[in-house]
Amino acid sequence: NKFHRFDSTLINISGKLLKDGLNLGGKTDDKQIKLSFGLKHSIPSSVRFCTEQAESSEDIALVRAINEAKLEKEDIILFDRGIASANTFKNLTQEEKQFITRINVNRCYELVKTKEVILIPNSDLEIISDEIVNLYARKKKKINNNVRLIKARNKQGDELWFLTNIMHLSSYDIASIYKRRWDIEVFFKFLKQHLQFKHFISYNQNGMQVYIYCLLIAAILFVIFKITNKLSGFKIALLQFTLMLEKAIIKDIVIFSGGNPELVELRL
């Protein structure tokens, strides 16, 4: 319940239809809508409409989304490698915002001290090292901000580097918590595949924002339905919701026609 995930998603729209949007492909007709979301308790907590060309960078867009979001002190912010600025990590630490992310392997840093690694047998990840470091920014400038760098290797042999400012949790806990970031990717998939979050009924910014808010309200109601009925997965929950809605509509038709709605339960 403490995990607050942040990520952005893109929607491609023809530049002939769209006045507002980011040019990410270098062509005037290649415009995209970029939205930065916050997700907590499986429910969208915030959405930010990116309008400036500079916000094509996650170091700007996603950081602004985090800064504008309503965060609790105990929240743990989860985001991917889109945010890579050492200064951003320093600012989050100074603002006492807990975060867990990944960084590119072989990122330049200065070692401050090494933490002891307690191995857990039969784990999906092998922890290679657990270190307190200072990262380097561009032009090899060291940023004086102690962060924790956890190096791990998965079963496929790929090396993963996790970065956090949380010092009291074990390295395995940090890696395990980061997996929960994937929940926002599942949410994006649900929006685009099942709620048709691929098309807009309006192509100006105000109209698109109204549409997005309506869509998110529908998504929140659907998540509440899923949790209330103790259903796992969006696909199964959507099927169950569709069947229940269909039955309710048929009952209304039967009542309107003067029939017995109880017979609907016997036949469906």
What residue spans do the PLM features occupy?
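Extracellular beta-strand-rich solenoid/capping regions of secreted or surface-exposed proteins
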Residues: 23-25
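Single, function-defining residue in the core of a domain
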Residues: 1-2, 6-17, 27-268
